[in-house]
């Protein structure tokens, strides 16, 4: 069976892992790094992903970052006059991860386990699955990030019974999950979180502080300057990372903007104490979900055996201190917070292929599910923290006499009124036979599958007529849209390959043009006027083809020039060999050896000159 890769599709960075010899292994990207920035950029119609996209983000306005925060929404990103859904942009990142995983494994990859924040709702989970499909991946399972982390942590500790609290603060989302581990069973007891809290918010707090300080000193508001804000974003992220290791850092941005008197520079020293002060409200927001999860699990902090920190933002000292204070535990430091989620996803992939035996994962739904009933009330059918997969039915009736149809409004959330919760979708059960209100029996059934994705069925028990929908939210993509995006993604992959082929061909052609001039110089008077004219004409033809930029034309001109140049190159080699033989005064065999040496030396010389 082909391998199932594990992907942590993060807000700031993504990571891909695979199970090798029963152990999860992180696959490095082409630059050799173990995580890849979740950044996509467009330049002159060309698409860039990862490190290269992030490096030029300051100067390229067509750069997309933190797209994960838009997953499950109908919001689109417009770049170079084209609209992209969050699913399409995420698919570009997934396609890149898939590509270098294939290079590493030496085989095609078609299946993946992708992680999502535990607090992702149905629309966000469905969007993630769609992104995988667009990228050419069969998403075998969507699993929660804290659960994946616990899976990687507990794989070699199956002989121990323990209760684990996973504190996951990533680039854009925050989750807390409490799990019970024992005898190969990983059971989630409770989960809580905040989908609008992460490392990006800590960066924004620093940016706000820098903008305010600069305005105070120079009277100029940098928040209106797009380029300055991008430079501030990079500087804030770097300062945040620095302050995890040192108590003070210097933020220096020369020529950040221009005033009446000329260019202005930003020079500010940021201490860890100041950073802690401006980010205190964010740190405090992590406390509520921790308490909520403990309460839902029916546990006190003394009953927690281990606290695992996940996500790059847990490196912030104030965050670690808040965790210590709230749990009365020293966090476990045996896992890499940036990689453990992808590794857990790879373990889950191994469970699905049968490579990992005797592991059972019992996850939960993070939010309650129900429907709107009379008076705009939210009636729950499945409570939050219910183990999935699950199914639940309840019988409802009509609100008016002779009501011909029932509108089913499906919601997810914890508030008592429907309007305050997240709408997952609406559908209608029609053709109900005329009857007084309260008489028809309408059975509504909720199903949540192993990926946390919801489907709902309504059935008229009198007529046995039923209507089923897999929830399709406003942001959901139809099969036709997904199919179109899959084709676009494949076309882009082909276009990228074609661009690479074109670049390689151009380089070879440029090298050949240079070689012509060098060969003419090396031969000096040994070359006849006819030979010289013939090779120069072929060279000029190739130069014109390069300017025209037509691939087939370049190929044809290059082949023609190679044919004309070959005899002249042989002349140069023979000349060099003869000169070497004369100098050595050697025998014929030795001369032949020198001729070989000449070939190698000339080859090396040319490559050096080209560089």
UniProtKB/Swiss-Prot annotation:
Pfam families attached to this UniProt entry: HSP70
PTM-bearing positions, type Phosphothreonine: 173
Compositionally biased residues, Acidic residues: 599-611
GO terms of molecular function: ATP binding; ATP-dependent protein folding chaperone; unfolded protein binding
Keyword Chaperone found: yes
Composition skew (Low complexity), residue ranges: 577-591
Endpoints of the signal sequence: none
Keywords: ATP-binding, Chaperone, Nucleotide-binding, Phosphoprotein, Stress response
Induction conditions: By stress conditions e.g. heat shock.
PROSITE patterns xrefs: HSP70_1, HSP70_2, HSP70_3
Start and end residues of each stretch annotated as Disordered: 577-611
UniProt-listed InterPro entries: ATPase_NBD, Chaperone_DnaK, Heat_shock_70_CS, HSP70_C_sf, HSP70_peptide-bd_sf, Hsp_70_fam
Function according to Swiss-Prot or TrEMBL: Acts as a chaperone.
Assigned protein family: Belongs to the heat shock protein 70 family.
HAMAP family: DnaK
NCBIfam families in the cross-refs: PRK00290.1, prok_dnaK
Protein name: Chaperone protein DnaK
């Amino acid at each position: 069976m082909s391998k199932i890769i594990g992907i942590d599709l993060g807000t700031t960075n993504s990571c891909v892992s695979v199970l090798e010899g029963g152990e999860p292994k992180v696959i490095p990207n082409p630059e050799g790094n173990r995580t890849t920035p979740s950044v996509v950029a467009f330049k002159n119609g060309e698409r860039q992903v990862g490190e290269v996209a992030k490096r030029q983000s300051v100067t390229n306005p067509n750069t997309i970052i933190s797209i994960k925060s838009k997953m499950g929404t109908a919001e689109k990103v417009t770049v170079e006059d084209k609209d992209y859904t969050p699913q399409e942009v995420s698919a570009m990142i997934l396609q890149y991860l898939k590509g270098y995983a294939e290079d590493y494994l030496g085989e095609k990859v078609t299946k993946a386990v992708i992680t999502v924040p535990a607090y992702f709702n149905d629309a966000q989970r469905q969007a993630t699955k769609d992104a995988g499909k667009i990228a050419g991946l069969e998403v075998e399972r969507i699993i929660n990030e804290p659960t994946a982390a616990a899976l990687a942590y507990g794989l070699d500790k199956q002989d121990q019974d323990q209760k684990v609290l996973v504190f996951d603060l990533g680039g854009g989302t925050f989750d807390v999950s409490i799990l019970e581990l024992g005898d190969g069973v990983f059971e989630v007891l409770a989960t809580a979180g905040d989908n609008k809290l992460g490392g990006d918010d800590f960066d924004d707090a620093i940016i706000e502080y820098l903008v305010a300080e600069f305005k105070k000193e120079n009277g100029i508001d940098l928040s209106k300057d797009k380029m300055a804000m991008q430079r501030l974003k990079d500087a804030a992220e770097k300062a945040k990372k620095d302050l995890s290791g040192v108590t003070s850092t210097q933020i220096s941005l020369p020529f950040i903007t221009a005033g009446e008197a000329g260019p202005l520079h930003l020079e500010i020293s940021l201490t860890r104490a100041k950073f802690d002060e401006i980010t205190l409200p964010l740190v405090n927001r992590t406390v509520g979900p921790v308490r909520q999860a403990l309460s839902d699990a029916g546990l006190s902090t003394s009953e927690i055996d281990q606290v695992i920190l996940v996500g790059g933002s847990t490196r912030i000292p104030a965050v670690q201190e808040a965790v210590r204070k709230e749990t009365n535990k020293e966090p476990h430091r045996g896992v890499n917070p940036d990689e453990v989620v992808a590794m857990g996803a790879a373990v889950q992939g191994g469970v699905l292929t049968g490579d990992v035996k005797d592991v059972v994962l019992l996850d939960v739904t993070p939010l309650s599910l129900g429907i709107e009933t009379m008076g705009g009330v939210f009636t729950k059918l499945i409570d939050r923290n219910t183990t999935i997969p699950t199914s639940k039915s309840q019988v409802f009736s009509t609100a008016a006499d002779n009501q011909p149809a029932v509108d089913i409004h499906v919601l997810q959330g914890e508030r008592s009124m429907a309007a305050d919760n997240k709408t997952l979708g609406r559908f209608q059960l029609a053709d109900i036979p005329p009857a007084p209100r309260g008489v028809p029996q309408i059975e509504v059934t909720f199903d949540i599958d192993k990926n946390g994705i919801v489907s709902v069925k309504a059935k008229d028990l009198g007529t046995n007529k039923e209507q089923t929908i897999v929830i399709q939210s406003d942001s959901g993509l139809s099969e036709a849209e997904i199919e179109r995006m899959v084709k676009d993604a494949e076309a882009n992959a082909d276009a990228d390959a074609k661009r690479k082929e074109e670049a390689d061909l151009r380089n070879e052609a440029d090298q050949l043009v240079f070689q012509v001039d060098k060969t003419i110089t090396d031969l000096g008077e040994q070359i006849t006027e006819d030979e010289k004219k013939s090779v120069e004409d072929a060279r000029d033809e190739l130069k014109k083809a390069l300017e025209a930029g037509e691939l087939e034309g370049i190929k044809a001109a290059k082949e023609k020039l190679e044919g004309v140049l070959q005899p002249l190159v042989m002349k140069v080699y023979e000349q060099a060999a003869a000169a070497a033989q004369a100098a050595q005064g050697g025998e014929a065999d030795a001369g032949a050896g020198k001729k070989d040496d000449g070939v190698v030396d000339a080859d090396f010389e040319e490559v050096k000159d080209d560089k």
